[in-house]
From Swiss-Prot:
Pathway: Metabolic intermediate biosynthesis; 5-phospho-alpha-D-ribose 1-diphosphate biosynthesis; 5-phospho-alpha-D-ribose 1-diphosphate from D-ribose 5-phosphate (route I): step 1/1. Keywords: ATP-binding, Cytoplasm, Kinase, Magnesium, Metal-binding, Nucleotide biosynthesis, Nucleotide-binding, Transferase. This is Ribose-phosphate pyrophosphokinase. Binds 2 Mg(2+) ions per subunit. Coiled coil: none annotated. The lineage of its organism: Bacteria, Pseudomonadati, Pseudomonadota, Alphaproteobacteria, Hyphomicrobiales. It is an enzyme of class 2 (transferase). Belongs to the ribose-phosphate pyrophosphokinase family. Class I subfamily. One of its GO terms (cellular component) is cytoplasm.
Length: 310
């Protein structure tokens, strides 16, 4: 087993290797003067079980091309099996036709990864579970819920916690966390009038006196969560904390979170935190290295990955 990484999230790749007690593979990923990407694998991978850790996060297109070229380099170097480890799968929100004459980009990206030569995909909290079916190769979608649930238990009295979905579409994810915490569930019903804007409408469930835990897979602009926090506090919640798997945090999201009613935003390191995120007073990062590392180990040993969530 050998683990390699592109440039998107080397800190996470190094942490995964530390968990596995293996060195990070020696590979060069650089750009020519015209910004073409060049990859060179600097050690023998012939006959090896290779894992490439690469989030296709901002800049998504550059990191995607790095991944594709690394897969191609491994295939041409006679690796026995190539697993693309995608802590964050970019383009996942483009999982359906949004209107006439629009693409399904998530499917296209899945095809590209497959055609480049990947034999298997390992990813975390896909935006929509059915994206697994976009790949024509085995795909394991891991869940961050055990990590998030453990952190909630470490920081809150679960007897007073209520898990809240920020929209109707996230109810399944919220229910899974509430089951792990053995607590009640509430829903924020919102209306999105136009792209980039969200308006909180009302809260379904009695949150009065509760420590509310908002749960979602992605925070991008932060508008939905900040508005949801305000609505919950108006309904009598004692505090509101958001637990989000993927901290995209584009544009002015970090500043928006910092000035919001959120007690804290907890994200994973599926996307490498920026300096702004690391210095924010109310944003905290929890590691997925153990989860991803164990999944990689089980894959290499031909053991069950689903057993991680039993």
């Amino acid at each position: 087993m050998k683990v390699f990484a592109g440039n998107s999230n080397r800190h996470l790749a190094e942490a995964i290797c530390k968990y596995l007690n293996v060195p990070l593979g020696n590979a060069t990923v650089k750009r020519f003067a015209d910004q073409e990407i060049f990859v060179e694998i600097s050690e023998n991978v012939r006959g090896e079980d290779v894992f490439i850790v690469q989030s296709t996060s901002f800049p998504a297109n550059d990191h995607l091309m790095e991944l594709l070229i690394m897969i191609d380099a491994m295939r041409r170097s006679s690796a026995k099996r190539i697993t693309a480890v995608l802590p964050y799968f970019g383009y996942a929100r483009q999982d359906r036709k949004a209107g006439p004459r629009t693409p399904i980009s998530a499917k296209l990206v899945a095809n590209l990864i497959t055609e480049a030569g990947a034999d298997r995909v390992l990813t975390l909290d896909l935006h929509a579970g059915q994206i697994q079916g976009f790949f024509d190769i085995p795909t394991d979608n891991l869940f961050a819920a055990p990590i998030l649930a453990r952190d909630v238990k470490d920081h809150y009295d679960t007897n007073n916690v209520m898990v809240v979905s920020p929209d109707v579409g996230g109810v399944v994810r919220a229910r899974a966390l509430s089951k792990r915490l053995d607590c009640l569930l509430a829903i924020v019903d919102k209306r999105r009038d136009r792209p980039g804007e969200s308006e909180v409408m009302n809260v379904i469930g009695d949150v009065s006196g509760k420590d509310c835990i908002l749960i979602d897979d992605i925070i991008d602009s932060g508008g939905t969560l900040c508005n949801a926090a305000e609505a919950l506090l108006k309904k009598g919640a004692t505090s509101v904390t958001a637990y989000i798997t993927h901290g995209v945090l584009s544009g002015g999201a970090v500043a928006r979170v910092a000035s919001s009613k959120l007690r804290e935003l907890v994200i994973t390191d599926s996307i490498q935190p920026t300096t702004g995120v690391q210095s924010a007073h109310n944003i905290r990062v929890v590691s997925t290295a153990g989860l991803l590392g164990e999944a990689i180990n089980r894959t290499a040993q031909e053991q069950s990955v689903s057993g991680l969530f039993d």
